[in-house]
Amino acid sequence: MSSERYLNHPTFGMLYQVSPGNDGRDIYATLYAQKMFFLVEIKQREVFFEVIPYLDARNQAELNLQKAKRKGSEELSKWENLFTQTFL
């Protein structure tokens, strides 16, 4: 199982990975502040943050869970736990 992933946002502080996203962009949420969600794209020397609505983040996380279940992924329990802690 892979370890948790964190990033530091210049304004909102620590973010943790909620779900992998599409096109190399992952979904992160604020760790300490009010729940805000970001679509994060990491390129060679730059990190791009795009604020996304709660329902979009939840939908993407649900799609990731379905994909992990279909594939029988070893990380399924990790994503289920993160989904429960973040959205339920």
Segment roles from a protein language model:
Residues R5-H9:
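A short beta-strand micro-motif
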Residues F12, L39, L82, T86-L88:
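Short, aromatic- and cysteine-enriched interfacial helices/patches
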Residues M1-S3, E74-S77, F83-L88:
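Short intrinsically disordered terminal tails
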Residues T11-K71:
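Acidic, low-complexity, intrinsically disordered interaction modules
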Residues P20-G21, Y32, E80-N81, F87-L88:
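Ubiquitous "structural anchor" signal
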